[in-house]
Amino acid sequence: MDDIPIWRIRQAGPEDAEALSLVGSATFLESFAGVVDGSGIIAHCVHQHSAETYRAYLAKGAKAWLAEVEPGHAPVGYAMVCAPELELAHAGDLELKRIYMLSRYQGTVLASALMQAVVAAASGHARLLLGVKEDNRRALSFYAKHGFETIGTRRFDVGGKTYDDFVLARVLTPAPAQ
């Protein structure tokens, strides 16, 4: 997209749970329709992308950011970090649980700005971890561009069907001593 509108990245709070849910469900459907079984997508979105799920993550200390565009701060992407839920996590790691962008805005400055916000917030952690579907080449390329490397694999359930994911990590620069 060459003509990107005025945009911003801002930290999201519990009051943004509906926007996180909407973007999470829309991007999951957009990314995996025709790849993952339709009923599985619906079940996954109902459970994993509900506003209640986002409120619960935020209440437990997760942090999220929204990418918004004008007019009216329309949500087009988001990222969320939380305490690691991945088996390959070590003490001091942080998990990039989700980073999603509507396809119209993928490959624009918004996606990189969203990742920069996440990396800045992760300062002081040892590594930033994430899981990604093993054949999602576009996402794998984006993560490689941002310093992530494959450290292992996991199985990921979507609506009762299991898929293979890569687990990626980015080593973070320690926070400066004060």
Annotate each PLM feature.
Residues 3-7, 11-17, 22-106, 112-121, ...:
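Acetyl-CoA-dependent GNAT
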Residues 112, 135-152, 161-163:
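Conserved active-site alpha-helix within GNAT-family acetyltransferase domains
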Residues 122-132:
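Conserved GNAT acetyl-CoA-binding A-motif
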Residues 162-171:
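Accessory recognition modules or surfaces
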